[in-house]
């Protein structure tokens, strides 16, 4: 159902459009919908306000004409007469055919019911539909005769009745809807013929020109099309529950009688429209105003009655629009069909057997609009869709012919539904919008969107499940791909975590090692102080032996050397060598202590006569040992090499005041004609880093020295057998080392 907010917005837009046109001076007529104007620029009749009245108190006796397509078996029916709100239906025995034939024309000037002789009331039960069709046809003939008699009576009272007091009963859709409710069968009717909501709708009396134009248009359509037998209606019909009143001048009663004459069972009107009716239509439509009766709710009650696949329309609305002054043609959205079609996609508004009494009116337009807003009927939801409009007459055709024609029309309707263009293309330019007075309701409760979306989702899920089952049956079960990315991320995270953890551990270890080394150093310092004070050597040795990793510290060996020196003679050189092997640092302090011990004159040595000779020999042995330790330092572990303090090599060049300078020996390039020069060597002073020299043994052969490098001239004489050397000056290192350098 369309929500009230939408109709309110539509009304606001219409009001603003009308104000804008009035301000611009472009409002040529009183039409509130200028976009609905026909090609002949006919003015539109004004719409009549509507209210809602009770449903149980009123009865509709005359049905509105039905817009029809140019079908083969369905012809146009008569335009209605007046209806009074005081008329009530009466029941007759079921033998009358259980069919509603309450068409009547009131000739009373005050709009009162003409009496029992002018009305044919036939009502039966709501569930029995077994009455034969012949009885129905006879009832229809009797109904038409009664209508003709009423029109004749009203024609005689033409000159005496005032214009405002004459009422013509309007055939509304209420009767059709109540018939359909009686049978619990859906009825497809255009919005222009819908029954109003009985609780909130009353009809005001419009102007006289309206009825005049409607009668003229009715005559035009009836002259244009032939009156043939309509499809028989099956089942029982429920009485009308709604009436509408439309005033009509007495001058038009003659035309109304002509309309009634045309509805005779055997009568066939001419298929050409007389020129005087066209002129009358042009004159009457010049002053006509739009009559819009707001569309109300359409509801389907499928569970109230015994049959589960029957529906009841509880309320319906009527919308009357202006007559398009153009060629009498049907709207493309109104398709042909039969009275018993069961197509699942046929919507309720697509009534194939409805007749139209106005050429190309807005009934079909609103009908198409309602079609686009109504939900689809499912298969088996309704037994049949029977043309229950009272204006459609029953002919003498048999039931078999009716069923066959209905089935054929259902097939054509299905094909036309598939090939018909979308409804919006008809509504954009010509479909009228509802005026103020109530929201437009053209669905049966819930819009299509709210019903189709869950169905689509459910259908998609079902298809997905079926596809999975098919894959499983075919053995096409897709395995889960390996989670490579996630595992990689986990590995990276673990690596990062382990890296930072390892760094933290290293820092903690360094801190602990530093604290331990500080403690050991402090302990060894205390031991030295105790030795200087003259504490017993046994106690000091016990303390030294209890210190962990004390051998890596030079102070440990210093303490041990002093303790051994206090006791007597000992092997100082062996102690020094052992300290170097253990990686004691700093080794320079230990060297100084060892030299001091060796130079002590008070020390007594066996086999030596002079202390000076012993001191010199000890010094030379210490220097040799230092050289050996330098070459063997490369064999130590990285930690030991870092902790061990390196003692620089003492060379004569350093003693001369040029530390780090060595001599590079290179052969002289071959010179043609000078063979004696080939035996000579070039000597070039170069600077070499002590750090690189210590690590050069671990370098690959490509990075090692290609030329021979010696620390002094004495080594040069020991290494090279060449007796003649040529000194070559190094421009980057201006050192001569005592060699004569020629300026040339």
Swiss-Prot record:
Alphabetical UniProt keywords: Cytoplasm, Cytoskeleton, Isopeptide bond, Phosphoprotein, Ubl conjugation
Composition bias, Polar residues: 76-86, 102-129, 137-154, 199-216
Annotated localization: Cytoplasm, Cytoskeleton, Spindle pole
Glycyl lysine isopeptide (Lys-Gly) (interchain with G-Cter in SUMO1) cross-link, renumbered residues: 195
Modified residues (Phosphoserine): 744
Region (Disordered): 35-56, 76-169, 182-216, 317-337, 428-452
GO cellular component: centrosome; cytosol; mitotic spindle; spindle pole
Crosslink (Glycyl lysine isopeptide (Lys-Gly) (interchain with G-Cter in SUMO2)) position: 195
Modified how: Ubiquitinated by the anaphase promoting complex/cyclosome (APC/C).
Superkingdom of this protein's organism: Eukaryota
Domain notes: The KEN box is required for the association with the APC/C-Cdh1 complex, ubiquitination and degradation.
Task of the protein: Microtubule-associated protein required for mitotic spindle formation and cell-cycle progression in neural progenitor cells.
Family membership noted in the UniProt record: Belongs to the CKAP2 family.
Protein name: Cytoskeleton-associated protein 2-like
Gene that this sequence comes from: CKAP2L
């Amino acid at each position: 159902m369309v929500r009230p907010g939408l109709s309110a917005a539509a009304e606001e837009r219409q009001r603003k459009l009308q104000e804008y046109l009035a301000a611009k001076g472009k409002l040529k007529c009183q039409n509130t919908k200028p976009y609905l104007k026909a090609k002949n620029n006919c003015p539109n009749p004004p719409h009549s306000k509507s209210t809602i009245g009770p449903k149980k108190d009123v009865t509709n006796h005359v049905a509105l004409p039905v817009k029809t397509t140019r079908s083969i078996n369905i012809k146009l029916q008569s335009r209605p007469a007046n209806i009074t709100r005081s008329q009530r239906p009466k029941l007759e025995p079921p033998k009358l055919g259980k069919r509603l034939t309450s068409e009547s024309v009131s000739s009373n000037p005050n709009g009162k019911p003409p009496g029992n002789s002018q009305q044919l009331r036939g009502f039966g039960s709501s569930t029995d539909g077994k009455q034969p069709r012949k009885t129905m046809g006879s009832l229809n003939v009797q109904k038409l005769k009664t209508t003709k008699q009423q029109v004749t009576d009203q024609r005689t009272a033409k000159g005496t009745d005032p214009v405002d007091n004459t009422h013509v009963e309007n055939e509304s859709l209420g009767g059709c809807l109540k018939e359909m409710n009686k049978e619990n069968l859906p009825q497809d009717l255009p919005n222009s013929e819908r029954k109003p909501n009985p609780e909130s709708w009353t009809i005001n009396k419009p102007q006289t020109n309206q009825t005049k134009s409607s009668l003229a248009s009715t005559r035009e359509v009836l002259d244009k099309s032939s009156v043939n037998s309509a499809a028989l209606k099956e089942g029982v019909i429920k009485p009308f529950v709604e009436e509408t009143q439309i005033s009509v001048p007495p001058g038009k009663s003659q035309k109304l009688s002509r309309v009634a004459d045309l509805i005779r069972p055997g009568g066939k009107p001419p298929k050409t429209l007389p020129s005087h009716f066209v002129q009358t239509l042009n004159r009457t439509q010049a002053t006509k105003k739009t009559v819009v009766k707001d569309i109300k709710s359409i509801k389907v009650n499928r569970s109230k009655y015994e049959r589960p696949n029957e529906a009841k329309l509880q309320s319906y609305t009527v919308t009357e629009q202006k007559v398009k002054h153009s060629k009498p043609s049907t709207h493309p959205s109104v398709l042909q069909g039969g009275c018993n079609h069961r197509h699942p996609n046929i919507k309720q508004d697509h009534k194939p057997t409805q007749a139209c009494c106005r050429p190309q009116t807005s009934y079909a337009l609103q009908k198409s609009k309602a079609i686009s807003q109504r939900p689809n009927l499912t298969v088996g939801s309704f037994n049949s869709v029977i043309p229950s409009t009272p204006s459609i007459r029953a002919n003498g055709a048999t039931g078999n012919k009716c069923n066959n024609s209905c089935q054929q029309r259902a097939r054509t309707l299905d094909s036309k539904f598939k090939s018909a263009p979308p409804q919006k293309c008809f509504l954009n330019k010509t479909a009228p919008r509802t005026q103020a007075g109530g929201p437009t309701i053209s669905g049966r409760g819930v819009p299509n969107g709210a019903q189709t979306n869950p169905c689509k989702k459910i259908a998609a899920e079902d298809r997905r499940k079926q596809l999975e089952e098919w894959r499983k049956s075919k053995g096409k079960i897709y395995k889960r791909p390996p989670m490579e990315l996630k595992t990689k991320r986990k590995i990276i995270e673990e690596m990062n975590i382990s890296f930072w953890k390892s760094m933290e551990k290293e820092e903690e270890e360094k801190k602990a090692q530093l604290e331990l080394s500080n403690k050991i150093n402090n302990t060894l310092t205390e031991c030295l102080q105790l030795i200087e004070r003259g504490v017993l050597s046994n106690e000091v040795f016990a303390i030294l032996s209890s210190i962990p990793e004390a051998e890596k510290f030079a102070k440990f060996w210093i303490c041990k050397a002093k303790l051994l020196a206090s006791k007597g003679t000992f092997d100082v050189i062996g102690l020094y060598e052992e300290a170097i092997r253990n990686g004691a640092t700093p080794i320079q302090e230990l060297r100084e202590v060892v030299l001091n011990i060796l130079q002590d004159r008070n020390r007594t040595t066996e086999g030596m006569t002079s202390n000076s000779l012993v001191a010199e020999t000890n010094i030379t042995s210490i220097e040799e040992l230092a050289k050996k330790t330098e070459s063997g330092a490369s064999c130590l572990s990285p930690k030991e090499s870092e902790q061990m303090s390196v003692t620089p090599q003492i060379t004569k060049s350093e003693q001369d005041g040029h530390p780090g300078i060595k001599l590079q020996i290179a052969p002289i390039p071959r010179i043609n004609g000078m063979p004696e020069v080939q035996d000579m060597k070039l000597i070039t002073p170069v600077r070499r880093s002590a750090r690189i020299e210590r690590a050069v043994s671990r370098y690959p052969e490509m990075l090692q020295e290609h030329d021979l490098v010696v620390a002094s001239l004495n080594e040069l004489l020991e290494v090279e057998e060449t007796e003649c050397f040529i000194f070559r000056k190094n421009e980057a290192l201006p050192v001569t080392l005592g060699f004569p350098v020629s300026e040339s």
